[in-house]
A protein has these predicted regions:
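Cysteine-nucleophile protease catalytic domains, especially the papain-like/related folds used
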Residues: 4-95
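Sec/Tat-exported extracytoplasmic proteins
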Residues: 55, 59, 155, 159, ...
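...with weaker cross-activation on analogous glycine-rich loops/strands in unrelated enzymes
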Residues: 76-139, 181-191
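Primarily a LysM-type cell-wall glycan-binding module
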Residues: 138-158
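Active-site or metal-binding loop neighborhoods of secreted/extracellular toxin and effector enzymes
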Residues: 176-249
Length: 249
């Protein structure tokens, strides 16, 4: 008796990964640069201050939406979005406005997004807020181990663009590159410098579609806002705060 034929092997269908569409630029975005946020500014500037480009050399507390305008700080659990956009706008009423995520900001403004964490792995009943800001240009200082290919991959741009930014010359540590790239960055409180990747290590093209699950799971998208690209202030108005306004353009 002949052997029974084996059933055909089933091929599992895989769902192709959807490419995240980049959001429109106003061309007034703050360039992505690590310094001074990565070193001297790491501890004194949280995600809110970073998103609106309000660098200060010293802060005695983290910046909170509504604090600058004098609203009570401790009223919100940050597990929901109610009232938060109004608090952000109240800090800079003529310099911030709400906008649909897919709509371009007007000239002189750039886009930020706000999310909150309804849950966390620590068992805390309070949540947290978090902000992202959009960029259209990268200012990058080359470091040991960099290649034109690795930089292109990191920022999701063609190799030829990085090669052109480098003048077509060999890699040199310390050399500064400037090139176009459309993505969002964020800063994890006082713990990190600027980050262009999400919790999965992927470049953030649209924060709404990024992995936002850290110790706090920032699963709730609140809104997008357009922020004036200069002169925005957040946090305490205490006289001890030393201001080092960055040149933004």
């Amino acid at each position: 008796m002949s052997a029974r034929p084996k059933p055909p092997t089933r091929v599992r269908k895989t769902t192709p990964t959807k490419k995240v569409k980049a959001l429109p630029l106003s061309k007034s975005e703050i360039p992505f640069r690590l310094e001074p946020w990565h070193t001297n500014g790491r501890r004194s500037n949280n995600c809110y201050a970073y998103a609106v480009n309000d660098y200060e050399s010293y802060r005695f507390s983290k910046s909170v939406p509504g604090e600058r305008s004098g609203k009570p700080v401790g009223f919100h659990t940050y597990t929901h979005c109610k009232g938060l956009a109004d608090r952000v706008i109240s800090d800079n009423p003529k310099k911030v406005y709400k906008v649909p995520a897919a709509k371009k900001c007007k000239n002189g403004y750039y886009k930020i997004m706000m999310v909150v964490a309804p849950s966390n792995k620590y068992g805390n009943f309070t949540g947290d807020f978090h902000f992202y800001k959009q960029h259209g240009v990268v200012e990058y200082k080359m470091k040991e181990g960099d290649t034109y290919t690795s930089i292109a991959k990191r920022f999701g741009v063609p190799y030829s663009r990085i090669l052109k930014a480098g003048g077509g010359t060999p890699i040199k540590v310390g050399k500064k590159l400037r090139f176009k790239a459309n993505f969002f960055s964020h800063k994890m409180g006082w713990a990190t410098g600027p980050l262009e990747t999400d919790a999965s290590g992927k470049l953030i093209k649209d924060p709404r579609k990024a992995n936002r699950k850290y110790g706090y799971n920032y699963s709730k998208y609140c809104c997008s806002m357009c922020v004036k690209n200069r002169g925005v202030d957040v946090g305490s108005t205490n006289s001890k705060v030393g201001k080092d306004r960055l040149k933004t353009l």
